[in-house]
Amino acid sequence: MSMKESLRKHFSMERFRKIWWKMLLLGLGLASVYLAAYFVAGYHIDFSSITDTIQEQANINLGNILLIGAYIIVLNSLLEEFFWRGFIYDKMRVQFPGWITHAITGLAFSLHHIVFYYSWFSLPIVAAITLGLAGYAIIMNLLFEKTELFSCWLVHAIVDIAQIGIALMVFT
């Protein structure tokens, strides 16, 4: 299937218009989980060392985090959903039973993100984040099965807004 055919197949604005408010609520619910985890676990984490590392290695700081955040929220979330749900998951679900596809893509999605946080936290926290991301990916797979990529994109973008909000709190 060509990219154009894949885009046409997975992006249904007609369907999205009917359910966008449900996706907004789901996104807010998942974002609340991220925020709750931050407020609960945040007391046990030295965020100053993380911000120092991010500033040194990636040149991300309070001055440019909004621009980087806008990229992550709008474009990166779209690219990730198209790749992980619209391509990888869509191809795998045809060839493997559902639970195998969910497990593999959930784990792969979380490991794809581990490069960003493995050096910031202790092993138990890295494991918890990785399992949480795998669970999130499975939720997104199930959402993709029932809806289309616009819905996945909106939910992902809302979760990313929460993450950028956390980053702003950490940097200030």
Task: Place the predicted regions along the sequence by residue.
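Residue-level recognition of pore/gate-forming positions within transmembrane alpha-helices
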Residues: 106-110, 157-160
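Structural signal for membrane-spanning alpha-helices in multi-pass inner-membrane proteins
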Residues: 1-3, 34, 38, 42, ...
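Membrane-embedded alpha-helical segments of multi-pass membrane proteins
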Residues: 1-2, 62, 66-70, 130-135, ...
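Functionally important transmembrane alpha-helices
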Residues: 123-172
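Structural signal for the C-terminal ends of transmembrane alpha-helices
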Residues: 1-9, 143-146
